[in-house]
Amino acid sequence: MKSVLISIHPKWCELIASGKKTIEVRKTYPKLPTPFKCYIYCTQDKRLSFWRGKAYAYAYDIRDNGKVIGEFVCDLIGLHPGIDVPSSCVPIEELKKYANGKMLARWHISDVKIYVRPRELRDFGKTRPPQDWCYVDAE
């Protein structure tokens, strides 16, 4: 069964793990029936780290950035103009700029699981992270 590996910046990973961010906004979306599983790849950031044990909060140790830190179920996808989407935690002006007058896909985030130990990309048959998202085979 196909799943998705999605690249997300550390600041958004923290908000997803805390339950504050329940919508992921993207320009595209997978052609999969919902619900489907999404694996969260926490992108590398030289200044911030999301992954710090059970606290799941920023720290100055960035060794675990660049790994798959958890998963969620996308149970609904909706198209939306680039206007206010409060559950995305993205400011309206940033959404408008990102949308550039086009529709955006709202991926609804549910059933978030953060791993006790982050996983490597090679566990998903990948040697480098996706620019945005990519299909992967489910385990």
Role assignments for model-derived ranges:
Residues 1-139:
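Structured alpha/beta reader/binder surfaces that contact nucleic acids or chromatin modification marks
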